[in-house]
């Protein structure tokens, strides 16, 4: 994708969907529009990237999107609603490099479903295609009376 300083090449990740590489304007209004409200930013990775999310997403009841996991694979938080993975420049957000875009597309590729069990939250990968119903191989039993 062609980049200039007025646009950012980022990953947009919506609940239940695969990440999409998109171009957005490099301004606050465009970031807010992309996540549906006030933005928050988190820097959970060692790479020069940030997650830009709706700061009020959980309070608004937006659907949980993806789990954030520590280095041991344990979930420590979940992002609600649409979020962006953006690059970091010296003082501001920047376009993702092709390598970072590929890395984080793979990390967040599989949509996740969240299931509350008591006071625990279970995170399950969503299948790419809905399961198809298998044809029945046996006919219903007939009863003689």
Model-derived regions: residue spans:
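N-terminal nucleophile
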Residues: 2-131
